[in-house]
């Protein structure tokens, strides 16, 4: 039992230097970041869509998706604000399987962490600079935040990480919105405790230093469904669950109440077409209840170029992890959301 060094110490600053945003690109990104913060704080009433592939497995496919998404964003910008999922690190339930671009920059080849770090930076950089969109990623490894903190505009803490103290404390120091998912058990209390920790100042050791954070008032809820002890998914996007979550926000006195519904995972049972029905149901609930309308203002949607999933990266733009909506279904869903909001 041991840790075996497989390479020299990685120079993060050298990796970052190759993909620094130009002053003009940074200005555009910061403008979009201000819009995103205004949406989460309630100053801007547009709907937030965090959408894109389950995992960013192929740079060119992801960029083709990003170009199309940027065009779609322009058409719906008065009602909908889109942040693109560029998820480069994937949690694995038992440690096996594809762990994301950071581990495997080429999904058909052996893992290479040093090349993976460079590939992650390059992908976020290219999406931002070539399309004008801003990006979201999962903070699977808190120690890697320094790799992307200047590029990523939205961070998610996943269902398997939300109970971890380091994830919570690092989230409290991020100068960007952080979505906290409910754990796989579905326990909302765990998620709200994570949000409380993230919204408050914390002191801890990080990268070999004692640090104090400012607290992150933009930490918020992502409801992703649950898995019970029998392996059956239990959705939590329903009317009563939403009111329960809103009530917890009120009881705990947390800042900027904001709920995103993750339309895939255990809400859909990974039946990707169910994402359409889930969005429709949530929009109906918003119309029915003013509290829900005020608080449930975001959706996380998994979509790519091709419908479904594949075991090997053979079809261009088809997921190799969870199944996703293809492009035609994605456009139809976003246009339906827009039409509903316009009524």
PLM feature segments, named:
Residues 37-45, 251-256:
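Glycine-rich phosphate/diphosphate-binding loops that line cofactor/substrate pockets in enzymes
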Residues 1-40:
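N- or domain-start disorder-to-order transition segments that initiate the globular core
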Residues 52, 261, 326:
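Conserved, mostly hydrophobic/aromatic
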Residues 48-61, 322:
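Conserved phosphate/anionic-ligand binding catalytic regions in large, soluble enzymes, centered on
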Residues 66, 79-244, 248, 265-270, ...:
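Active-site-facing alpha/beta catalytic cores
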Residues 54-57, 256, 264-270:
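Short acidic, Gly/Ser-rich segments with clustered Asp/Glu that frequently serve as metal-coordination loops
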Residues 303-341:
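Internal helix-turn-beta structural module
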